[in-house]
Amino acid sequence: MREIVHLQAGQCGNQIGAKFWEVISDEHGIDPTGTYHGDSDLQLERINVYYNEATGGKYVPRAVLVDLEPGTMDSVRSGPFGQIFRPDNFVFGQSGAGNNWAKGHYTEGAELVDSVLDVVRKEAESCDCLQGFQLTHSLGGGTGSGMGTLLISKIREEYPDRLTTPTYGDLNHLVSATMSGVTTCLRFPGQLNADLRKLAVNMVPFPRLHFFMPGFAPLTSRALTVPELTQQMFDAKHGRYLTVAAVFRTAVCDIPPRGLKMSATFIGNSTAIQELFKRISEQFTAMFRR
């Protein structure tokens, strides 16, 4: 089985991650105690991608939860699916990063990163055939940005042949729904893009053109046809699409997304990503001049 180890760092990353586990646990028929209550064999066929089967038929997420202060960890534990995680996989400090990138990357985060890597190593050792990691974190603040980038660099050093993919996000539910759609091919049986390596081969025409953009439709729960969903997902006004992987669910899929009768998710390799890099560069230049 091709497993994925999930990491979530900082307040934003943990809130998105908690919502993500709620969504995919619901899709796989896993209740908050880790017990399977589904009604389809498809839900269990590739469940080991994100879950480890423990004693007593319990399913435990392959998740590592990280923060530099205990507050977020407490809120995750007290959440609806807080008891499903392995207690040893909560790694947190006491001081916090104070929205300071340098603290998360060089001081407090650097002191905690070895403990995080030990937990990541244990999760990786329990996998039969690890295909990669996914990390949810914010691009601002201290822990998510500072320690998030530190974790990515450390993972690249220790697992150089794995694909590291930071995710995107503002709205937790939208991000978790998009992540659920993107990982559908990995979690359920299919012929196309069944693991991260195949996805990378299909989506990256040239090594340096490896920046993906996600899309999701519909944003409101209403009846749509497949052509209407496709039209909502794509924006042909900005940039040119080099490669696209689209996942349509419910009309042609036995397991629909939660709360929607039909949805579509895509990952696109588009030249429109250059506008994001330009905007970040301009904002950095403006702040640096001050």
Curated annotation (Swiss-Prot):
Motif MREI motif in this chain: 1-4
Q: Which residues carry this modification: Phosphothreonine?
A: 55
- Where Mg(2+) binds, per the record, is at 69
Q: Name one GO cellular component term.
A: motile cilium
Q: Which GO terms describe its molecular function?
A: GTP binding; GTPase activity; metal ion binding; structural constituent of cytoskeleton
List the GO biological process terms: microtubule-based process
- Main location per the UniProt record: cytoplasm
Which residues bind GTP per the record?
11, 69, 138, 142-144, 172
Signal sequence region:
none
Free-text description of this protein's post-translational modifications in UniProt: Some glutamate residues at the C-terminus are polyglycylated, resulting in polyglycine chains on the gamma-carboxyl group. Glycylation is mainly limited to tubulin incorporated into axonemes (cilia and flagella) whereas glutamylation is prevalent in neuronal cells, centrioles, axonemes, and the mitotic spindle. Both modifications can coexist on the same protein on adjacent residues, and lowering polyglycylation levels increases polyglutamylation, and reciprocally. Cilia and flagella glycylation is required for their stability and maintenance. Flagella glycylation controls sperm motility.
Q: Where are the transmembrane segments?
A: none
Q: Which domain of life is it from?
A: Eukaryota
Q: Which cofactor does it need?
A: Mg(2+)
Provide the positions where the record notes the PTM N6-acetyllysine: 58
CDD domains (alphabetical):
beta_tubulin
Compartment annotation: Cytoplasm, Cytoskeleton; Cytoplasm, Cytoskeleton, Flagellum axoneme
Q: Does the keyword 4Fe-4S apply?
A: no
> Keywords assigned by UniProt?
Acetylation, Cell projection, Cilium, Cytoplasm, Cytoskeleton, Flagellum, GTP-binding, Magnesium, Metal-binding, Microtubule, Nucleotide-binding, Phosphoprotein
Subunit annotation: Dimer of alpha and beta chains. A typical microtubule is a hollow water-filled tube with an outer diameter of 25 nm and an inner diameter of 15 nM. Alpha-beta heterodimers associate head-to-tail to form protofilaments running lengthwise along the microtubule wall with the beta-tubulin subunit facing the microtubule plus end conferring a structural polarity. Microtubules usually have 13 protofilaments but different protofilament numbers can be found in some organisms and specialized cells. Component of sperm flagellar doublet microtubules.
Give the protein's function.
Tubulin is the major constituent of microtubules, a cylinder consisting of laterally associated linear protofilaments composed of alpha- and beta-tubulin heterodimers. Microtubules grow by the addition of GTP-tubulin dimers to the microtubule end, where a stabilizing cap forms. Below the cap, tubulin dimers are in GDP-bound state, owing to GTPase activity of alpha-tubulin.
Domain comment as written in the entry: The highly acidic C-terminal region may bind cations such as calcium.
Family according to the record: Belongs to the tubulin family.
Q: What is this protein called?
A: Tubulin beta-4B chain
List the source organism: Mesocricetus auratus
